[in-house]
Regions:
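Short, well-ordered alpha-helical microsegments
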Residues: 69-72, 131, 154-158
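Solvent-exposed alpha-helices and their adjacent loops that cap or buttress functional pockets
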Residues: 54-56, 111-116, 140-141, 160-162
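Short, well-ordered alpha-helices that flank and scaffold nucleotide-derived cofactor binding pockets
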Residues: 47, 51, 77, 81, ...
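Conserved acidic residues
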Residues: 60, 118, 146
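Active-site-facing substrate-recognition patch
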Residues: 1-56
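Short, glycine/charge-rich flexible loops or terminal/linker lids adjacent to PRPP-binding catalytic cores
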Residues: 73-133
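PRPP-dependent phosphoribosyltransferase catalytic core
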Residues: 2-13, 137-175
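Short glycine-rich phosphate-binding loop at a beta-alpha junction
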Residues: 56-67, 149-150
Length: 175
């Protein structure tokens, strides 16, 4: 797919070594922790969601597995650069930090912004094996997840989103 979007063109350039790597998730983390990569990644994710009719305002929270904290932060900063408000919460293993929100059994499940009554999108770049668990845990707080975004095309994430009845989006990183 040909594009003239400067963010997507920059992401394609930055992501080329990532896609050739035997461990693309580790390389994705490196990319999102770089100044140029973080700025581009946040805008790409927001733009992808907008292309799927999910603009900030339709959601006010991004939920991410803890391994995707840098991507969640990139989205927050990109939204702020557009004059928009976006918060984030990280899904944690049962033994998360003391500052996390607890579920009914006292297990810590989320860290970051409060979830109650929020509408969220889910980032799916690292541990989406927890997708169903994240969806159920968010639901306990009255949080509705309306979409799923990934910087790396991921068939498992696409399948999860389809089964959950939510939009899935990922950029076309090839030419």
């Amino acid at each position: 797919m040909t594009t003239h979007d400067p963010h997507l063109l920059t992401l394609r350039t930055l992501a080329a070594p990532l896609l050739e790597s035997p461990n693309p998730l580790a390389r994705l983390n490196e990319l999102t922790l770089s100044a140029q990569g973080a700025a581009v990644c946040g805008h790409i994710l927001i733009d992808l969601l907008e292309e799927h009719d999910l603009a900030i305002g339709d959601y006010d929270l991004v939920i991410a597995p803890e391994g995707d904290a840098a991507l969640a932060a990139a989205m927050i900063h990109a939204a702020g650069g557009r004059g928009l408000d976006l918060d984030a919460a990280l899904f944690l293993p049962a033994q998360g930090p003391a500052s996390a929100i607890n579920n009914a059994e006292g297990e810590r499940r989320f860290s970051g912004s409060p979830l109650s009554g929020r509408t969220a999108v889910l980032l799916a770049n690292s541990a989406l094996a927890d997708g169903e668990e994240i969806l159920a845990a968010a639901s306990e707080y009255g949080t509705e997840i309306v979409g799923c975004a990934s910087l790396l095309p991921d068939e498992a994430a696409r399948t999860f989103a389809a089964s959950a009845g939510i939009a899935y989006c990922s950029p076309a990183l090839g030419d």
